[in-house]
């Protein structure tokens, strides 16, 4: 679970087995992700990003905010690394035509996870 404090997110240990939002579910023990009860195959780092976004749905985060929350503030990593992992997440979510989840880009700022309405499909 993540809590927003003064514009920053803070990781708090999630004791629940599953975190769910709309069609998306992550298993906090096995570190697996599911959309419409179908497992999506993603890397461990993409899983951490998905976990962060899932705990903050419909919230846009800057690339720097995602880096700080997922990698830690002491890591010097380029913004392109985030873009690569977001591309991986997009492809994984698009693989299943039944999955209504979408990674949205906030141009020149960052990303969020959203639920696509039936009209958007």
Model-derived regions, located:
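DNA-binding patch around the recognition helix
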Residues: 16-18, 41, 84-86, 90-121
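A structural micro-motif at secondary-structure boundaries
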Residues: 20-47, 112-121
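Intrinsically disordered, low-complexity regulatory regions of eukaryotic regulatory proteins
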Residues: 3-4, 25, 49, 81
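Positively charged, aromatic-enriched patches within helix-turn-helix-type DNA-binding elements
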Residues: 32-44, 48-85, 91-96, 101
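Basic, amphipathic DNA-recognition helix from helix-turn-helix-like DNA-binding domains
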Residues: 1-22
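N-terminal hydrophobic or amphipathic segments with adjacent small-residue motifs
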Residues: 17, 25, 31, 66, ...
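Compositionally biased, intrinsically disordered low-complexity segments
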Residues: 6-7, 69, 87, 106
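Generic hydrophobic-segment detector
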Residues: 12-13, 21, 27-28, 62, ...
């Amino acid at each position: 679970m993540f809590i927003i404090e003064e514009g920053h997110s803070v990781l708090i240990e999630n004791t629940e087995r599953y975190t769910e939002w709309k069609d998306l579910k992550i298993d906090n023990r096995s570190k697996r992700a599911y959309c419409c009860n179908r497992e999506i195959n993603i890397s461990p780092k993409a899983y951490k990003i998905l976990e962060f976004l899932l705990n903050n749905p419909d919230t846009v985060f800057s690339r720097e905010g995602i880096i700080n929350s997922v990698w830690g503030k002491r890591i010097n990593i380029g913004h392109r690394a985030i873009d690569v992992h977001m591309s991986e997440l997009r492809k994984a979510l698009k693989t299943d035509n039944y999955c209504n989840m979408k990674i949205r880009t906030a141009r020149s700022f960052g990303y969020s996870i959203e639920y696509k309405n039936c009209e958007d499909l």
